Regions:
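Short Gly/aromatic-enriched secondary-structure transition segments
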Residues: 86-102
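N-terminal post-signal-peptidase region of extra-cytosolic proteins
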Residues: 52-70, 82-84, 101-112, 119-125, ...
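Bacterial N-terminal signal peptides that target proteins for export
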Residues: 4-21
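Short, low-complexity, disordered segments immediately C-terminal to signal peptides
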Residues: 38-48
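Bacterial N-terminal signal peptides
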Residues: 20-31
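Low-complexity, Gly/Ser/Thr/Pro-rich intrinsically disordered linker/tail segments
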Residues: 205-364
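Bacterial signal peptide processing site
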Residues: 34-36
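Exported/periplasmic cell-wall-interacting domains
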Residues: 113-273
Length: 364
């Protein structure tokens, strides 16, 4: 009887893997991970739990597993940060995870099929978590958000998931995304209604902004930097509104939240924190000074997206098959491995005239 049950479970698992392979054949033609992130309902799998090492790190930093969480993503650096609220009521960095793969190039996602990974501000609720993802576990970023929908941007089901494969998603190791999933799931089940994801092209320092001074997305990135600075300066989650075709942060409006993202912003109900406004204004001045001083931007030669240097070294050393086996529990193939070997940002990290890419406080 035991052997019969074992064989039945094995057959269901192999059937699911066959479906995964079939989906993978068409996944590269899709704009997001929607078809490639099917739920494997007949494969028994318990949701990941927070590892003891991560719980110990939380305790060391004055955090509780139940406390609110916030996620930041940086394309150029191929890093994802998990922040937790500590005993002071402010957010502190818990851990930084290297991303194995993201697709497209720097800049927002605007249309179905452009392979772009989203940039902007997103909010993830428990219903957007997938514990039975083909890519181990995943959560949906919620693209397009209200602003993107109003602007006519198209695409759907852009995820953070496991395996080293991306078609508009952010991909990590199964172990890494399992930790992240467990941390955010615990926060959501403990009372946090939804957690904020801030997806950036790079760490939004004046020096990095200057490195991209000639990019057509610079005006959009300056808007993102306002939210970035608000978090950096306060360690509080910024309140995000949308009006005037852009994000607006930490602002109370007469009549409540603006209803039309494309209409001009209504009058404010009360002044924003003057000290914070002054500090953000100073950051804007630093950006303008750095951009003015910098020479023309280096033209980056994109093939397709990026990969954290640690994974690129493994890819060069071991090849895509061994890297896939190391990253993914089902050895899901690395997407476009030849493109992953290219580093379009290498020439930018040590340029004179605009400084180096800044280091953020890092987890272990």
């Amino acid at each position: 009887m035991t052997d019969r049950k074992t064989n039945s479970a094995r057959d269901r698992f192999m059937s699911a893997i066959c479906r995964v392979a079939a989906v993978a054949l068409v996944g590269s033609a899709l704009s997001g991970c929607v078809a490639a992130d099917m739920a494997l309902d007949d494969v028994p799998k318990a949701p990941p739990q927070i590892p003891a090492k991560v719980l110990a790190e939380m305790s060391k930093k004055g955090m509780k597993a139940e406390s609110p969480v916030l996620v930041r993503i940086f394309k150029q650096e191929s890093e994802l940060e998990v922040w937790k609220m500590d005993g002071s009521g402010r957010y502190a960095l818990l851990k930084t995870y290297p991303m194995c793969r993201w697709s497209g190039k720097l800049g927002p996602k605007t249309k179905d099929g452009d392979r772009q990974a989203p940039e902007g501000f997103y909010h993830v609720s428990s219903g957007m978590l997938n514990p039975k993802s083909q890519y181990y576990v995943s959560f949906n970023l919620g693209y397009p958000n209200r602003l993107e929908s109003a602007l006519g941007y198209t695409g759907e089901s852009l995820m953070v998931h496991g395996a080293c494969s991306s078609s508009g998603c952010y991909a990590l190791t199964d172990q890494g995304v399992g930790e992240i999933y467990a941390v955010v799931s615990k926060a959501l089940s403990s009372g946090q209604d939804r957690f904020q994801v801030q997806a950036y092209p790079f760490r939004m320092t004046p020096e990095n902004m200057a490195l991209h001074k000639d990019d057509a997305n610079l005006p959009f990135w300056k808007t993102l930097k306002e939210g970035y600075d608000a978090f950096e300066l306060t360690r509080q989650q910024p309140k995000v509104s949308v009006c005037g075709r852009r994000y607006v942060f930490n602002t109370e409006f007469e009549g409540g939240e603006p209803r039309d993202p494309l209409a001009a912003c209504p009058a404010t109900a009360k002044p924003s924190d003057p000290q914070l406004v002054a500090k953000i204004a100073l950051e804007k001045q630093k950006v303008e000074a750095a951009v003015t001083k910098a020479s023309s931007s280096t033209v980056m030669s994109y093939v397709d997206g990026g990969m954290h240097p640690s994974f690129r070294q493994l890819l060069k050393k071991d090849g895509p098959e061994k890297l896939a086996a190391r990253i993914s529990s089902i050895k899901y193939p690395v997407s476009r491995p030849d493109a992953a070997l290219a580093d379009p940002f290498k020439a930018m990290t040590k340029r004179t005239g605009a400084g180096q890419v800044a280091d953020a406080p890092r987890g272990d």
